[in-house]
C-alpha cells in the first residue's frame, strides 16, 4: 500500500496534486483506504499484493499503476475485472513501463484483436515538460540505444532477448494448454 499512497495518492502526479491543479479538493482518509473528492466521488485504494481485497467490491473505474510488476497479477486482475460492474461503461486505465508478463501479453493481444482493450504507448520524451532537463540528459546519455533504454525511454514491449536460441513467440507456439489424459505412473 505504500506505493499506492506515495505515488498514486500523495505523489507529485498523484490524485491529490492533480485534483488541486483543477481546483478540486481531495482528501486521503488513511483508515478507510480511500480518497474523497469535494464533488462526492470516492477512490478506493487497493494493492495487487492483496488480491483478495478486490474480491467482492464493485467499481466503475480503476487505475492500475505499474501493472507489469504486480506480484499476484492474475488474481488481482481477475478480482478487479469481476468487480467492474457499476455504471454504463466500466473502464480500467493501466499505466506501466512495459514488461512481458502473462497479463500484459494477454492485454496487448486483446488490443490487437480489436477487443475491449485500447493500447496507448508513450515515451519518456513525451513527458519532458514535467521532468528536469538534467534527468532527461542523464538517462538518455546512459540508456539511449540499449535494451533497457528501449523499454524505459521508448516504451517498447520487448519480447525477445538478443542472442537467445528461441523467441518467446516460438516458445509460446509450443506450449501445452493442459495435459490431456494424464497417466499416473506407479512403481
Summary of predicted features, one role per range:
Residues 1-4, 89:
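Conserved SF1/SF2 helicase motif Ia
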Residues 3-60, 157:
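Inter-Walker segment of RecA-like/P-loop motor cores
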Residues 34-38, 108-115, 174-180:
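Short, conserved catalytic or adaptor-binding loops enriched in Gly and charged residues
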Residues 65-67:
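Walker B catalytic acidic pair
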Residues 69-145:
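ASCE P-loop NTPase helicase motor core
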Residues 128-187:
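ATPase catalytic-site recognition across NTP-hydrolyzing enzymes
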Amino acid at each position: 500500500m505504500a506505493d499506492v499512497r506515495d505515488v498514486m495518492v500523495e505523489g507529485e502526479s498523484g490524485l491529490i496534486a492533480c485534483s488541486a491543479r483543477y481546483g478540486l479538493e481531495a482528501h486521503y482518509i488513511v483508515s478507510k483506504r480511500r480518497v474523497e473528492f469535494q464533488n462526492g466521488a470516492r477512490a478506493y485504494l487497493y494493492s495487487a499484493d492483496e488480491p483478495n481485497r478486490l474480491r467482492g467490491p464493485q467499481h466503475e473505474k480503476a487505475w492500475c499503476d505499474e501493472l507489469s510488476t504486480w506480484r499476484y497479477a492474475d488474481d488481482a486482475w481477475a478480482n478487479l475485472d469481476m468487480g467492474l460492474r457499476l455504471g454504463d461503461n466500466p473502464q480500467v486505465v493501466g499505466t506501466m513501463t512495459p514488461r512481458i508478463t502473462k497479463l500484459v501479453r494477454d492485454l496487448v493481444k486483446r488490443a490487437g484483436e480489436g477487443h475491449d482493450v485500447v493500447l496507448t504507448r508513450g515515451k519518456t520524451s513525451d513527458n519532458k515538460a514535467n521532468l528536469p532537463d538534467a534527468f532527461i540528459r542523464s538517462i538518455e546519455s546512459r540508456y539511449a540505444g540499449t535494451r533497457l533504454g528501449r523499454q524505459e525511454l521508448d516504451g517498447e514491449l520487448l519480447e525477445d532477448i538478443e542472442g537467445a536460441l528461441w523467441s518467446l513467440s516460438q516458445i509460446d507456439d509450443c506450449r501445452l494448454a493442459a495435459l490431456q489424459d494424464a497417466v499416473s505412473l506407479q512403481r
